């Protein structure tokens, strides 16, 4: 038992540094371990939650987050805007010579004028899209309500009557040709009085009038009366 106790006393205990390894003049092992524990221990804020090591300012040797570079905004006077707008109305894509001329007139740099024209073109495209967007869902039938109706014609033109069809008279072919005499010519209309009653003609179609009688022409030369 005594031998085992001596062995345990001779063995270095875990968690402790053997004092024989440190030369004289160095602090004690317990003090060194305490310092190491403090350096590895995370920083704690007032609430007790570990917040990690505090970030140092750029002056302390560590870089912080890069600050966003602020853009310099150019302020245009009303006279400058008027000149730029008039030039934009004439030409939306001016060349280098036109921009340099505007720079001399307005007192601005050529680069500022180029940026202004780019922004102005983008603004115009945005305005055009905003105007066309409400009309995109409308159907073509909807546009018919916006169109004005054609004015009514104040004059009314009569419709032309249907064409009349002439039917040949049946007696023109049935009766043989007879010499034209006064008696037969006078009885001819009487014999045709019953035809319309027996054969009514359709509406809009009237029989052709009979051909006029052909009178014999005398080919003898006229006699001179002396």
UniProtKB/Swiss-Prot annotation:
Subcellular location, record wording: Nucleus
One Pfam family this sequence matches: Homeodomain
Residue ranges, compositional bias (Low complexity): 196-206, 216-226
Region of interest called Disordered, as start-end residue ranges on this chain: 1-77, 175-226
UniProt main location, coarse: nucleus
Record InterPro entries: HD, Homeobox_CS, Homeodomain-like_sf, PROP1
PROSITE patterns according to UniProt: HOMEOBOX_1 (PS00027), HOMEOBOX_2 (PS50071)
Tissue: Exclusively expressed in the developing pituitary gland.
GO terms of molecular function: DNA-binding transcription factor activity, RNA polymerase II-specific; RNA polymerase II cis-regulatory region sequence-specific DNA binding
GO BP terms in the entry: pituitary gland development; regulation of transcription by RNA polymerase II
Gene Ontology cellular component list: nucleus; transcription regulator complex
Keywords: DNA-binding, Homeobox, Nucleus
DNA-binding region as annotated in the record: 69-128
Biased composition (Basic and acidic residues): 1-11
Biased composition regions of type Basic residues, renumbered to the chain: 64-74
Function: Possibly involved in the ontogenesis of pituitary gonadotropes, as well as somatotropes, lactotropes and caudomedial thyrotropes.
Family, similarity comment: Belongs to the paired homeobox family.
UniProt name for this protein: Homeobox protein prophet of Pit-1
Species the sequence originates in: Sus scrofa
